[in-house]
């Protein structure tokens, strides 16, 4: 027997049933996708779909060459024809904005776009963190004021309500100011951290040289006291940045959205400025961040477009659905309405015709395939979770009748005219 080929470590199959190490099912995932489609339409967002492979330079320019994502986590390879460096996308914003700039989508008006799809990072797989993972992203492009900052947070809070997990999530916010303010803070931060360089771990020492703001994001418990006493970026904000942040917080207060100000919240990508935020939970162990985002007012210009202030966020679907499956609520209905079975010569063709007619009227129908006893077919109908069973027997073909059974028992089992089949099922379903 040939050796089985396994899936790549950290990249999961999504199956009709849960697995030992990955309990999410395809039907649960699809129910979430349906919810997201309704949710984004309600806020006026249009979907965009981009390739999973992009030029590596896109992410170097947008995310930052010295970030962990670009430096250590991307899957990068060369195109064999022209040696062009390509990468599997590690996040969705850069690809979305590349498409916006390439196709001039901001020519006439601002855009509200959303996407959903797989991303890839070479990380150590663990619960809630995978090498292929999926994100839903929201991007509001060409909007300058703090009102859109507050709106997208209210939008995310609305989704948490729909999923029944609002009480398990905490909103953390911060302001990163503008480029000049960050530069002044960076100088003070480097001076401060250099005094403690001997106490820093290797990762923080590397970040001190490449991206010192990210040192504040360390999870090392031995460094928390040092980081807590570090210069705060909020103390370096100018009047315009302070006003933007204050108006943003006032809007959250007015909307009744509670938040925690976290002066060490910096996010892991270099393109952020002004407002940044994360939704976190204590229900998923180390993988606390479920959703995060912020402003990236200079990114579109950095990618070759005209300046356009923008903001967005992304949520990890696997991590979010792990939380929903444990603590939330998501209406999932994978069971068919009808399991159609047949018995005797000629009944197999007739049941196929009835099944097609029912599907045309909006019923979900599983048609039994093969030639088993009625008892065996009924067992499969029961296992399918179908609400109703349709039985077409050879001796009923001549008089044009069928047998219907309510698997829940409410209407029992009845013989009805084939012409009344759809109406009877509709009445039973609505009862």
UniProtKB/Swiss-Prot annotation:
Enzyme Commission (EC) number: 6.1.1.21
Gene Ontology MF annotations: ATP binding; histidine-tRNA ligase activity
One GO cellular component term: cytoplasm
CDD domains in alphabetical order: HisRS-like_core (cd00773), HisRS_anticodon (cd00859)
Cellular compartment(s): Cytoplasm
A Pfam family it matches: tRNA-synt_His
Ranges in coiled-coil conformation: none
One of the GO biological process terms: histidyl-tRNA aminoacylation
Keyword Glycoprotein among record annotations: no
Keywords: Aminoacyl-tRNA synthetase, ATP-binding, Cytoplasm, Ligase, Nucleotide-binding, Protein biosynthesis
Entry keyword annotation includes Protein biosynthesis: yes
S-S pairs: none
Catalytic activity: tRNA(His) + L-histidine + ATP = L-histidyl-tRNA(His) + AMP + diphosphate + H(+)
InterPro entries (UniProt xref): aa-tRNA-synth_II (IPR006195), aa-tRNA-synth_II/BPL/LPL (IPR045864), Anticodon-bd (IPR004154), Anticodon-bd_dom_sf (IPR036621), His-tRNA-ligase (IPR015807), HisRS-like_core (IPR041715), HisRS/HisZ (IPR004516), HisRS_anticodon (IPR033656)
Family under the similarity heading: Belongs to the class-II aminoacyl-tRNA synthetase family.
Subunit relationships: Homodimer.
Protein name: Histidine--tRNA ligase
Record organism: Neisseria gonorrhoeae (strain ATCC 700825 / FA 1090)
Taxon lineage: Bacteria, Pseudomonadati, Pseudomonadota, Betaproteobacteria, Neisseriales
